[in-house]
Design a protein with these regions (language model features):
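Short, surface-exposed loop or secondary-structure junction motifs
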Residues: 54-56, 110-325
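A short acidic/small-residue loop/turn micro-motif
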Residues: 54-57, 317, 340-342, 410, ...
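Short, conserved catalytic-motif segment at the N-terminal edge
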Residues: 10-71, 93, 104-108, 146, ...
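Active-site SXXK
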Residues: 21-24, 44, 68-95, 173-181, ...
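Acidic/histidine-rich, surface-exposed loop or edge segments in extracytoplasmic proteins
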Residues: 2-9
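Short, small/polar residue-rich loop motifs at catalytic or cofactor-binding pockets
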Residues: 32-35, 317-320, 391
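Peripheral terminal and inter-domain segments
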Residues: 307, 328, 345-470
């Protein structure tokens, strides 16, 4: 899926994308993260998608925007989508008891007066069920079959009464997958393929566990240990809890699912759910006591900085993934990593923080006169990475100036320096920084070699040398 070049080429958007790219690559390199892939979606277009580092370190196979990752619990959002399709088709109701569709379901409990577990409870994680089925599969990675999972219910009991507390449960969503099968008459994987993936054109997405030797799949790695070592992570098939955590996809393919969330109108074709049902899934159905977070139908909903977002994260051995959507801005960010210590949530939050406002600004200016001075194309010769013994810096082309950032910082925009050209002085700029420690007002001078390439930069009285990579 090609990025939306018209929006990505707007100076303010391009500058913010360069910052995201520089920050992600720096964070990846300093943390030793093998690889990562990200995509940013606005409404029905992919604004930007890229890979960083390695899909397979040993084979030197780069991570790209098309690299596939195990998305683990993001699978739950597809299971919820299937449930709502079946609800809209009249095959079930959200407040149906679980036992109505799964007559074999029974679990002990000490809450005799509690309402029976319903399908809605499964999707909102308010069923009170245990987090997992009755097996230690996160220890030995021997996931039970659906049959063994059902047999194991006889050894389990509900932890809480229904509707008393939000309690995340893989078991609940595994049972929701069983409901999909019972209500549709199709195996879960076939239903998702035929009714969700195919209509959305998600050709690179797999419902069942992938072949570990698939050349398009990112290799899974464990966390980095105190001695700096990082070994491979085990390949797993989640079997009986597949409806909770088994799918595989790329950031560009998952972008198609993100685009669905912004659509409206009746169901049909790629509109696999009517707009009103999508809104129903995306609104709060269970609110946390702090009123800052809640749960929709399959989606985690957060409120921060005056903005509401929804989405889901995923975690399987060797993979950490995140899908986050800001409906008011029609913005979605997807991040996938191939190690146990990846931090895709911070990646999506930073990307939204840096790119969201410029996209909104670019759209607002699309039909208005833009009097801002465009950056001089000759400034591209200064763009690059620089290093001193004290730290790193990256020079980027902004919307009307050069930007100098330290991409190794957790939030480099807190220390950004804008470089304004000094008239009549070649290769010379003036530092414009809000932080008084950051050489504000001093000269920034680039030195070039005979070929016109920047070799170092003087900031104030001290130098950083140009480097090819971190």
């Amino acid at each position: 899926m090609a990025p939306d070049l018209a929006l990505a080429d707007r100076p303010e958007v391009r500058a913010s994308l360069d910052i995201v790219s520089a920050w992600v690559e720096s964070q990846r390199a300093y943390s030793g993260l093998p690889g990562a892939s990200l995509a940013i979606v606005h409404d029905q277009t992919v604004v930007w998608a890229a890979g960083f580092g390695w899909a397979d370190v040993e084979r030197r196979r780069p991570a790209t925007a098309e690299t596939r990752y195990r998305i683990a619990s993001i699978t739950k959002t597809f299971t919820a989508t299937a449930i709502l399709q079946l609800r809209d088709a009249g095959r079930l109701q959200l407040d149906d008891s679980l036992a109505r569709h799964l007559p074999w379901f029974s679990i002990a409990g000490k809450h005799a007066d509690a309402p029976p577990i319903t399908i809605r409870h499964l999707l909102t994680h308010t069923s009170g069920l245990p987090r997992e089925a009755a097996f230690p599969y996160w220890t030995d990675f021997d996931f039970p079959t659906a049959e063994r999972l059902r047999e194991g219910l006889a050894r389990q009991e509900s932890i809480l009464a229904t509707e008393t507390q939000w309690k995340y449960s893989n078991l609940a969503l595994a049972l929701a997958g069983d409901v999909v099968e019972a209500a549709s008459g199709e195996p879960y994987a076939r239903y998702v393929q035929n009714h969700i993936l195919d209509p959305l054109g998600m050709k690179d997405t797999r419902v069942l566990a992938p072949d570990p030797d698939d050349p398009g799949l990112a290799r899974a790695y464990g966390r980095r240990m105190p001695d700096g070592s990082r070994g491979p992570a085990p390949h797993v098939d989640t079997r009986g809890i597949s409806a909770a955590a088994n799918m595989t996809t790329s950031v560009t393919d998952l972008a198609r699912f993100a685009m669905l969330q912004f659509r409206d109108g009746p169901a049909g074709g790629a509109q696999i759910l009517r707009g009103s049902t999508l809104r129903e899934m995306q609104r709060v159905h269970w609110l946390e006591p702090d009123w800052q977070a809640g749960w929709g139908l399959g989606f985690r909903i957060l409120r921060a900085g005056g903005k509401t977002s929804f989405g889901h994260g995923g975690s399987l051995p060797g993979y950490r993934t995140q899908l986050r959507i800001w409906p008011a801005e029609k913005l979605a960010v997807i991040a996938m990593t191939n190690a146990d210590d990846g931090d895709p949530l911070t990646m999506v939050e930073r990307a939204q923080q840096y790119v969201g406002p410029p996209i909104a600004k670019a759209i607002a200016k699309a039909t208005a006169k833009d009097d801002k001075r465009a950056p001089d194309p000759a400034w591209r010769r200064y763009v690059g990475r620089y290093r001193s013994r004290w730290g790193d810096a990256q020079v980027l082309l902004g919307d009307d100036s050069l930007l100098l950032i330290d991409p190794s910082l957790p939030d480099p925009m807190l220390m950004v320096i804008r470089l304004q050209p000094v008239e009549g002085q070649a290769h010379t700029f003036r530092a414009d920084a809000k932080d008084g420690y950051a050489s504000h007002g001093e000269a920034v001078v680039f030195e070039l070699d005979a070929g016109g390439r920047a070799t170092r930069v003087r900031v104030g009285q001290n130098y950083l040398d140009a480097v090819e990579s971190w």
